[in-house]
Amino acid sequence: MSDLSAHTPMMQQYWKLKNQHPDQLMFYRMGDFYEIFYEDAKKAAKLLDITLTARGQSAGQSIPMCGIPFHSLEGYLAKLVKLGESVVICEQIGDPATSKGPVERQVVRIITPGTVSDEALLDERRDNLIAALLGDERLFGLAVLDITSGNFSVQEIKGWENLLAELERINPVELLIPDDWPRDLPAEKRPGARRRAPWDFDRDSARKALCQQFATKDLKGFGCDKLTLAIGAAGCLLTYAKETQRTALPHLRSLRHERLDDTVILDGASRRNLELDINLAGGRDNTLQSVIDRCQTAMASRLLTRWLNRPLRDLKVLQARQDSIRCLLDGYRFEKLQPQLKEIGDIERILARIGLRNARPRDLARLRDALGALPELQNAMAELEAPHLARLAAITGTYPELASLLERAIIDNPPAVIRDGGVLKAGYDNELDDLLAISENAGQFLIDLEAREKARTGLANLKVGYNRVHGYFIELPTKQAEQAPGDYIRRQTLKGAERFITPELKAFEDKALSAKSRALAREKMLYDALLETLISHLAPLQDSAAALAELDVLSNLAERALNLDLNCPRFVDEPCLRIDQGRHPVVEQVLTTPFVANDLGLDNSTRMLIITGPNMGGKSTYMRQTALIVLMAHIGSFVPAASCELSLVDRIFTRIGSSDDLAGGRSTFMVEMSETANILHNATDRSLVLMDEVGRGTSTFDGLSLAWAAAERLAQLRAYTLFATHYFELTVLPESEPLVANVHLNATEHNERIVFLHHVLPGPASQSYGLAVAQLAGVPSPVIQRAREHLGRLETSSLPHEQAVSKKTKGEPQAPHQSDLFASLPHPAIEKLGKLDLDDMTPRQAIEMLYQLKNLL
């Protein structure tokens, strides 16, 4: 709104502020409420389910309005942030008693989903990330910031496919993109995508701002000096963070250069299919993290989630973690550490709030307790001989001076906010103690003064009192007023009484009337000074928090290794993946019966397993457990297997199950083929590929053809491949592809009921047991019986299975006798011959047809 002259002074003030934030809800402080006006009010009333009303008129129109009590702000903010909304907080900074016109107000902070830091607005076990993008279809610069921890990273990524996979991994709640980008690009379809002015991404300005933030001459020390696109994106994030926080950001101390080549890459589909930290229903139960996360602190849980979503290919780091877990298992040392780590709490986010200068009293109390627990924890860490654990111990340190300061300053159980005082201990500051004593002991002072004055004057009817209009006074009946001492100054005449004040009472009044407000102001000033002291130690404290989080994760993995019977995998140079008695870490915990462990062997002689067997036989579980074992090995964890020997992999692909993409206009089969295409384009001889039922979403012939060709291609790529299928024709692949072998999940039938044995055995399955599974699922008996009739007719009418290549050698497992779908297709020449009407043909036509038929052979 540009013309404000027709509005009231208060609404003019409102619109001047609102016009600076047109796309965000504005909470406008008025007394004890935050008021919300105009379109913001209509939107907020609907989102928050609060009453929409009207407040007078301005510019000739009534003002739509709703409001919330100031002390209930956090609950409403949490709801709005969860809905993806951003909120501008506008506070009164002027004094209503001295203001002429509207009380002065200003925006003090902006709450957005990606920049919240308040504990009540965050999921303590999840990173809250904001990202920014710059680039074109060939190369992108990506910057990622977690304002609640200070983690700040950049990378450059080639192509949309890799970029979208990385966005799926980090899952930012906000994504900033330049406003001059074309509309409807893939990145903009993500929830939380917001456009920013192109100059926010200016690379020169970004470089200058980042160097200023980190107090460096250039960015070479961070290894990202030449990543100009990523630097532009990082500059945008820094600007956005400062704009929303309205304060310096001392907890942002460095920039980390991440490289895709350092990690095992998982695309979005693979991440979802493996249910690492989110299950297929969108929840957290029965995920890998739900099984292996018993961390004592929330900051360690977040670190473990990052490890799971970014497995490493750095052998040195992985072996250091393995050595650390062994050390912690030795003598069950983790059992001593874990209770001590629990005392540390989530100091990572506490320190971030201190850096943002919005830490609350209970944050400081928790930091006090954490620092107090450090010496005992350090003593325990000193006994850990593993080199990596020794490095973590050296980083952690102790902070006796800060611990002592917080112990002297903060009461044992402080209130939630500093607003009403009562946070600092008695004895911390003499002036504050005096002010509080005046305020708290005013009643006793008046009683004592009255007793002293009665004794001094001999006037038994003398009273000391107070009212809001005239303040403190000494009251005497009119008859005794003439006997008042000379230092009594007349203040008020009443019917039947006179009121006086003395220099002593006046001095007390001046102190008492302002003591409470002065005490609050003094306590707030001391609290802010305490925050500044902590900020000056922020760098080593943050390093300690990071080290303690990693120690917690490693202790957790040691505990899980013991209680889940996990063993240390061995990385080797020879390309291989050998698993002895492997188990699915999640399914094993859910089952009420013992899990059937299975072996797997892939190396230079066998790169692909064709897996056949009945539905529910365990094919998908076998494939998923393989991927999870490989992934756990690549975070440095022990794995659910008796033994495991593997080489480093570069990517993990899964094509397991599909659902349609209605919003994107893609059918189930289209989604399946898109995932398959991604695998065939990007898999290498270092990739692990899981393919489950490829081709089932289309006609039988098309599906089999695609599955066969995809399997051949993967065999030629030499990728480590597990290929589950119900197309038994594929079991002849080992005859033409020497790197392919057959295995099957066994089952048996007893009294016409199927029994799944879940053992993986060499060779192809003998039958699919499809009707038995259908019966087990509760398909009506008449339907099952009719299906048996159809099956019998189909089996007798199809041509016998023909071998695709030369006969197998004696003793080798045989492919099941099943009709060859390709063999059962009529030859075009036979099909055409069957349609001829020989009686209507002339000799010449017959000769021409013979030539045509010959050409078809």
From Swiss-Prot:
Gene Ontology annotations of biological process type: mismatch repair
Molecular function GO terms recorded: ATP binding; ATP-dependent DNA damage sensor activity; damaged DNA binding; mismatched DNA binding
Entry protein name: DNA mismatch repair protein MutS
Presence of the UniProt keyword DNA repair in the record: yes
Family that this chain belongs to: Belongs to the DNA mismatch repair MutS family.
InterPro entries for the chain: DNA_mismatch_repair_MutS, DNA_mismatch_repair_MutS-lik_N, DNA_mismatch_repair_MutS/MSH, DNA_mismatch_repair_MutS_C, DNA_mismatch_repair_MutS_clamp, DNA_mismatch_repair_MutS_core, DNA_mismatch_repair_MutS_N, DNA_mismatch_repair_MutS_sf
Spans traversing the lipid bilayer: none
Binding residues annotated for ATP, in chain numbering: G613, P614, N615, M616, G617, G618, K619, S620
Classification via NCBIfam families: mutS1, PRK05399.1
Role of this protein: This protein is involved in the repair of mismatches in DNA. It is possible that it carries out the mismatch recognition step. This protein has a weak ATPase activity.
SUPFAM superfamilies reported in the protein's UniProt record: DNA repair protein MutS, domain I, DNA repair protein MutS, domain II, DNA repair protein MutS, domain III, P-loop containing nucleoside triphosphate hydrolases
UniProt KW keywords: ATP-binding, DNA damage, DNA repair, DNA-binding, Nucleotide-binding
Record GO cellular component, one term: cytosol
Region (Disordered): 795-823
Pfam families in alphabetical order: MutS_I (PF01624), MutS_II (PF05188), MutS_III (PF05192), MutS_IV (PF05190), MutS_V (PF00488)
